[in-house]
Amino acid sequence: MPRVLLVDDDATIRDTLYELLSEHYVCQTAETAEKAFARLEADEYDVVLTDISMPGLSGLELLGHVRQKFPDTPVIIVSGIGDQEHAQGLIRLGAFDFLLKPFSLDVVEKSVRRAVEFRKRQAEENRAEDDDAPGNLTEAADWKIVKS
C-alpha cells in the first residue's frame, strides 16, 4: 500500500486527514517539519502532504528538503493563506499541488490519488531507464557500435 506522510500542527486536521486516507494508504503523521524530516529519513513515503504555516520550520522548508533529498516524492501543500499567484509560486518551487483551507475532503483525496499515481509512473520510468543501461561490464561488452 502507498505510504503518505501527513504534516500539520493542527491535531484536528491531522486526525481528519488520517481518517480520510488511512483506508487506502499507510499514513503516518508529524506535527512539525522537524519531526517530518526524521520520519522521511527513517522511512520511504510516496506522498508528503504538509501545511505551510507551522511553528518552527515551515512547510516551505520541508518542501525544499524533500525536493533536495527525495526528488521523486510528490509534496502537496495545504494552507489557509494564498491565492492563485501564491499557488503557482509553490508549484514552481516543486510542490505537486496546492490546496487552500478550508478544503473539501474529496479534493484532498483526489490530489493524493493523483500524486500516488504520478509517483508510481515515475518509479516505472526510472526502472525502465535502469533496464536500458548496461548493468555491468559484461553487459556493456555486448553492446555493438555501428558505424554509418
Residue ranges and their predicted role:
Residues 11-28:
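Two-component/phosphorelay signaling modules centered on CheY-like receiver
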Residues 32-35, 58-61:
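Acidic catalytic/metal-coordinating carboxylates
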Residues 44-49:
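Active-site beta3 strand of CheY-like receiver
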Residues 54:
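Receiver (REC) domain active-site loop signature in two-component systems and cognate sites
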Residues 85, 103-112:
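C-terminal output helix
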Residues 117-148:
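CheY-like receiver
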